[in-house]
Amino acid sequence: MTGLLYLQNSSGYNDCYFKTESLVDFLYRTLFIDKGSYLGVSFITAAEMRDLKIKHFGVNEDSDVLSFPIDEIAPGSENSLVYGVLGDIVVCPETVMRQAVRHPFEHEIYLLVVHGFLHLLGFDHSDAPSKKEMFSLQAKLIEDFFALENLGTPSEEITITPDLRPSLGRI
């Protein structure tokens, strides 16, 4: 199990943690992150998310996930695990609930934790090539996690790129 995972929930949605620890452990193993590396995952209210967006981005809007990297860490390799302070992933379950219309709430949570985790590792979707790389890896990670946890097949809606699915202001 991941050694320095800090989970926090101020959102009022008590089922946010469902398999979050297992997912993070899977991401550490799959992307060759040393299990002693720090990661924070927080589930917050829509008002808290808007406050973060205003403070850090100057934008007053809803968002489903934000990532705040600390150390510059990229995925490691089988022979060389990377170690450091990854940073924090912040998820708004209230927004997630609105987005998860045709698939289970927890599936959207998994997607956003993976998405946020990849941002902490330096992945981005600011241009077409980086977007393709990030979302291809994101889909593969989701599919592999679902297979590992016997969760069935993820819906196409959570494995396609965000520009093809309904959006509520993702970054």
Curated annotation (Swiss-Prot):
Quote the InterPro entries the UniProt record gives.
MetalPrtase_cat_dom_sf_prd, YbeY, YbeY_CS
Q: Which UniProt keywords apply?
A: Cytoplasm, Endonuclease, Hydrolase, Metal-binding, Nuclease, Ribosome biogenesis, rRNA processing, Zinc
Q: Write one Pfam family the protein is assigned to.
A: YbeY
The cofactors named for this UniProt entry are: Zn(2+)
Return the GO cellular component terms, semicolon-separated.
cytoplasm
Name the SUPFAM superfamilies on file.
Metalloproteases ('zincins'), catalytic domain
Which PANTHER family does the UniProt entry name for this protein? ENDORIBONUCLEASE YBEY, CHLOROPLASTIC
Family of this protein: Belongs to the endoribonuclease YbeY family.
Q: What is this protein called?
A: Endoribonuclease YbeY
Species in which this protein is naturally found: Tropheryma whipplei (strain Twist) (Whipple's bacillus)
Q: Which gene encodes it?
A: ybeY
